Amino acid sequence: MSAARLPSRIARHHPRGRAISISGPRRIRRASWALLLALSACRPAAPAARSGGVVDDAGDTVAVAAPPRRIVSLIPATTELLFAIGAGSSVVGRTEWCDYPPAAAAVPNLGDGIAPNVEAVLASRPDLVLLYHSAQNAAIAARLRTLGIPALRLNTDRLADVGRIGRLLGRVTGHAAAADSVAAVFDSALASATVTPTGPRPKVLLLVWEQPPMTIGRGSFLDDLVRRAGGVNLFEDVASSAGTVSIEAVASRDPDLILTTTAGPVAFASRPEWQAVRAVRERRFLPVTGSEFNRPSPRAPAAIRELSAKLRRAG
């Protein structure tokens, strides 16, 4: 399964099934974001800079005017990082999912970041565009560069990307010192928030889609978050960052908890086929609802502490 095909895969399954925590077209796109991040987590990071330009995570060397004054950020994580390092005033366009910090709401909403509206981007007169590293965005980046607009495709899939991408953005925008400070504070907070359990770790199913069941494997943001909070990913042995599993496989592994991203009732819990899973029968769901749980950001240490507290309360 490729990140590039993810949105269409979700669209195909929507008539027969639904995301565990979401409903409706806008939230389907939100699920696409979360899964896109997970599926691309296995890509190696490219070096941050080379002589003559900035090297993005697609390996492209891009000449960027220093510092850009009109940035379109089509990745929620980079929008958050730009504000964190003091470059928020340069952001002139964002996605509908760029919901943090609150000041980002004042930035014009250009719509979807998975399938960007190029005309809306061009209308913003950007001198830098930040795109998620996906096959679909390769053509968009190429078109923008042909028009003389620098475009960087970036991975923001893992906790390790917070400091790395933050420092890259700091150098590009002229906020290197602030970016180094944000990264250092983040690294320290991450170490402090990480839990080393004295007893067995609870097994947590990271379920992001119901029909067919899709889970997060090793190397993803949520996998790292759960591990640092003191749990263990039920499918940590799955080499791919995300994939389809059977309900029978879930039942045989007998998760202690099922992580969901909704605070309300979990609709699939009443479906007959899911009654084979003990955690479903016992309604052992672990809701995590904030945006800090769907993107690597400087808020990740707080997310780890919250998740750790939920794991302890769940027993």
Identify what each model region corresponds to:
Residues 95, 218-242, 262, 286-287:
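His/Asp/Glu-enriched short active-site or ligand-binding loop at hydrolase and phosphoryl-transfer sites
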Residues 127-128, 132, 138-214, 232-237, ...:
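Extracytoplasmic substrate-binding proteins
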Residues 118-125, 147, 244-254:
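Short helices/loops that flank or line small-molecule/ion binding pockets
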Residues 33, 42-79, 175-205, 254, ...:
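Bacterial Sec-exported substrate-binding components of ABC uptake systems
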Residues 69-134, 234, 274:
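A short, structured surface patch at a secondary-structure boundary
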Residues 75, 133-134, 208, 238, ...:
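Short secondary-structure boundary segments
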Residues 2-3, 8-40:
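Sec-dependent bacterial lipoprotein signal peptides
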Residues 55-59, 110-119, 135, 238-247:
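Short helix-initiation/N-cap motifs at beta->coil->alpha
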